[in-house]
Amino acid sequence: LGALKDFKILGIPFFKGYSAPKIGFNESFSFIYEFGEHANNQQSDTLGREKLTKSNELYTSPYHVGSGLFYLDQYLGKNILEESLREFASSNGKEPFKSILENKSNKNLNWFFNDYISDREAFDLHIKNTLKNKTTTSITISEKNGRKLPFKLDFIKNDSIVKEQWYFHSGKDSTYKLKRGKYDYVAINSNRYLPEKNRHNN
C-alpha cells in the first residue's frame, strides 16, 4: 500500500509516521487490539493524540487501523484501496478519503468509517444456529450489537481454507443457505483479519 506517513488519512492525526509495510497487517496486530479491548482499554481511532492513552497511541490504535485497512482491501478487491490511497496522496489530502473510495466502488463503506474506526466497541459476529440436510447447510449469523458489516465465510477442509465467500451482514439475524460440498465446516473470518470481541463462536 505504500507509505502513508504524510497524510492525515481517515481523519486520524497520529497516523503520521506509520507505513503499511511496517505495520505488516497480519493476525498478530489484531491480537494486539483484541488484548486492549478485552482489558477495556480500547478507544476510538479518531481521537486526537492528547486524548489517547499511551498504549493506544503507540500500539493498539495504529494496529487496529492497519488491520482494518487490510480487511477493507480484501473486501473491496481489484486494488481499489491501493489506487484510492495513491489518489488521496496525490491530492495532498484535499479530497476526503471516503469520497475517493466511494467513487471507485459501489460497496457499503459506512461500517468502516462510522463503526470500525469511530466506535470503541468491537464487532462480534457469531454463528447462532446451523441446520443441515442432504444437499444444503443453513447457518444463521448474528452480530451482538446489531451492526452492519461485511464478513468472509471460509469453507475449511483438513484445517485449510478451500473456498472463501463474502457476504454483507444486514445487522439483523440472517440465514445463509450453502450447498453441501467438499468441506468439513465453515467459519467466519478464520484468518483473524477483522478484530473481534469473541472469536470462539465464529
Question: What is the role of each PLM region?
Answer:
Residues S160, S190-N201:
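Short acidic/polar inter-strand loop motif in beta-rich domains
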Residues E83-E87, K152-F155, W166-F168, R199-N202:
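Composition- and surface-driven signal marking solvent-exposed, interaction-prone regions
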Residues L1-T140:
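Hydrophobic alpha-helical and helix-loop surface patches within well-folded domains
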Residues N103-S105, E143-N145, E196:
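Extracellular acidic, Ser/Thr/Pro-rich low-complexity tracts
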Residues L109-N110, T130-S190:
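Beta-strand-rich binding/interaction modules
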